A protein has these predicted regions:
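Membrane-interface interhelical linkers
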Residues: 1-34, 38-70, 80-90, 140-156, ...
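Juxtamembrane helix-start motifs in multi-pass secondary transporters
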Residues: 35-36, 95, 183, 245
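Alpha-helical transmembrane segments of compact multi-pass small-molecule transporters, enriched
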Residues: 42-46, 98-112, 190, 194, ...
Length: 291
């Protein structure tokens, strides 16, 4: 495989993992709605100039806009909402590991919605992912689950939504002539409108605060998440097959997020969490390579 493609995929994974981890700090300094509303607005400061100075923004026909909005809403609003809720109620390394099963659910989505033929390896990977999810939510020093049923489910739901959005709507739009930067612009605009609507409704009964410390984190994660991560990932896709790069991105994101949560947030995973992370990595790797 092209070594530059591997480098782009790994750096994209690091960028997104850093975004996931720093979001925990951002939510400690800023309200959820305020944080998620300003991030796409900040991202426009990077995406619009980049698009204007490179390939520009092109939309072959209006139908693609609707499909792109659907994928963007699923990814940037519904999926992000579940993930932010997950890291507020549980540790980042657990939430990120479950959310980063997105490549696995992307293959499932391709089978269900794009008509691709399922393989036995998909079901084997599903068992590994389920076992990994179980080990991730086991308390340190015990064999009991320390979270309610809904807490790990929110992070796993994030992975399902992200996997669907990255596979079905995105693939359809890009294969029908939409440029990557155009899809990226629609993604950010959809996020801005969605979270802006929520912010307007929320502000009627609650005062939304935008502290400078929180805005700095939001600006940083808008660059690493909405802009840099996507640019690097799309650059890697130009140099190698997506099926080759998916396990690199998915596995690396899980590993990077796990390590960064320990370094930056001082989380202390249990030994069961390490087992869970390994099982999920194997499951994602199997289904991405052989599925």
């Amino acid at each position: 495989m092209n070594s530059l493609a591997i480098f782009f995929a790994l750096t994209a994974a690091l960028s997104w993992a850093l975004t996931q981890t720093m979001a925990k700090i951002g939510l400690q300094r800023m309200g959820l709605v305020s944080y998620l509303f300003v991030r796409p607005l900040f991202a426009l400061l990077f995406i619009v100039p980049y698009g204007l100075f490179t390939s520009g923004f092109h939309l072959p026909y209006p139908k693609l806009a609707g499909i792109a909005i659907l994928g963007s809403f699923t990814d940037a609003f519904a999926g992000t909402l579940l993930y932010m809720f997950a890291i507020k109620i549980s540790s980042t390394h657990k939430a990120a590991s479950l959310a980063n099963t997105a490549p696995f659910w992307g293959v499932i989505s391709a089978v269900l919605f794009l008509g691709e033929k399922p393989k036995l390896i998909i079901f084997i990977a599903a068992i590994l992912v389920a076992l990994g999810a179980y080990f991730l939510v086991i308390s340190k020093g015990t064999k009991s689950v320390d979270y309610s049923f809904w807490k790990p489910l929110t992070a796993l739901g994030t992975g399902i939504l992200w996997g669907f959005a990255e596979t079905v709507p995105a693939k359809y739009c890009l294969t029908h002539g939409m440029t990557p930067i155009t899809y990226q612009l629609i993604l950010v605009l959809t996020a801005a409108v969605s979270w802006g609507s929520v912010a307007c409704l929320r502000s009627k009964n609650h005062h939304l605060r935008y502290p400078l410390r929180g805005l700095r984190i939001a600006l940083f994660t808008s660059f690493t998440g909405f802009f840099l991560g996507w640019i690097l990932w799309l650059s890697s896709l130009k140099l190698a097959l997506a099926s080759q790069l998916a396990p690199i991105r998915g596995g690396a994101m899980t590993l990077f997020a796990f390590i960064l949560s320990i370094i930056l947030i001082r989380e202390r995973p249990s030994r069961y969490s390490y087992i869970g992370m390994i099982l999920i990595l194997i499951g994602v790797f199997f289904v991405s390579i052989l599925g």
